[in-house]
Amino acid sequence: MRRLNKKKALNFVRELDAFPKVPESYVETTASGGTVSLLAFTAMALLAFFEFFVYRDTWMKYEYEVDKDFTSKLRINIDITVAMRCQFVGADVLDLAETMVASDGLVYEPVVFDLSPQQRLWHRTLLLIQGRLREEHSLQDVLFKNVMKGSPTALPPREDDPNQPLNACRIHGHLYVNKVAGNFHITVGKAIPHPRGHAHLAALVSHETYNFSHRIDHLSFGEEIPGILNPLDGTEKVSADHNQMFQYFITIVPTKLQTYKVYADTHQYSVTERERVINHAAGSHGVSGIFMKYDISSLMVKVTEQHMPFWQFLVRLCGIIGGIFSTTGMLHNLVGFCVDVVCCRFKLGVYKPKSMSDFDGQINSLTPLLSENAEQ
């Protein structure tokens, strides 16, 4: 009894087969069908190969939200070379609340302003990359995905001993400031505290020594990430006057970067540059120096590196294989039909299958005509 029930169940399942098998004796192979099959398998292999590279690739997803962190400190990473002696210049930060930030984290190093041949080559390469970034903004995704892998963004050390005197000052290091708008500036004289803010001892420096030609090797905010280029990296300005004033208006955007290699809380920024000559007689007032006025955006950007799921990769592969099979089968039938029409195998009113012709002959030979029956 159990065997009968099992046999009935198998027969029932067999009747539900949506993929009936055709015996090989009923299958006819042709050269055209083999050619189409070969082309189909080649196309499937190529598309599957390219799809594998799409599966391996990643992309950056950008999300925006309100920055709720107001208590933490903002780190400023600085590496600037000014064409003046270190004893003549001073750098400090004054925020929106008129709070002077101590510049103890900055190092003043006497250097030669002109770069060595190897350093100049590095600087030209950096400027070339910056130019491409300004033209092709999508390249920033490439930098995000390749952090910690690119060449170092710091100026390489001088490979030769300078013969000329140390006529410049390299100011490098980092500062921690409040997350409010502020002004980082480099001007004549060392900074001293003042009840109403701060002041610089500029009276002790000769006016003829003023030269605020400078080169920004690196300027970033937040955690410093090797391999990431910032908008002002590689900027070089040459002062044409002793009373030159350089201004940089910076908008900082907090950024959380999460890739498969690094997770960091950093900051991106955009900058607008302006420079002018201080001439009180002509109404152009101000102080000679380098001024970087920054403001912090209230929005935060989350940059996340994403990858195609494996199940989606399998679904796309199945779609490629099934789509090519169906398409090539339809095209093969369509081409075969067109060839038959061109070869005049199907002529309206003329072509008849052989079996039908034989059947008509048998009818004509065995069945008498009506006229013959009438005569008889």
From Swiss-Prot:
It holds the Pfam family COPIIcoated_ERV. GO terms for cellular component: COPII-coated ER to Golgi transport vesicle; endoplasmic reticulum; endoplasmic reticulum membrane; endoplasmic reticulum-Golgi intermediate compartment membrane; Golgi apparatus; membrane. Its main location: endoplasmic reticulum. It is a multi-pass membrane protein. It is found in: Endoplasmic reticulum-Golgi intermediate compartment membrane; Golgi apparatus, cis-Golgi network membrane; Endoplasmic reticulum membrane. InterPro entries: Erv, Erv_C, Erv_N. Residues 1-33, 340-376 are cytoplasmic. GO terms for biological process: endoplasmic reticulum to Golgi vesicle-mediated transport; retrograde vesicle-mediated transport, Golgi to endoplasmic reticulum. Residues 55-318 are lumenal. Keywords: Endoplasmic reticulum, ER-Golgi transport, Golgi apparatus, Membrane, Transmembrane, Transmembrane helix, Transport. The chain crosses the membrane at residues 34-54, 319-339. Belongs to the ERGIC family. Possible role in transport between endoplasmic reticulum and Golgi. PANTHER family: ENDOPLASMIC RETICULUM-GOLGI INTERMEDIATE COMPARTMENT PROTEIN, ENDOPLASMIC RETICULUM-GOLGI INTERMEDIATE COMPARTMENT PROTEIN 2. This is Endoplasmic reticulum-Golgi intermediate compartment protein 2. The gene is ergic2.
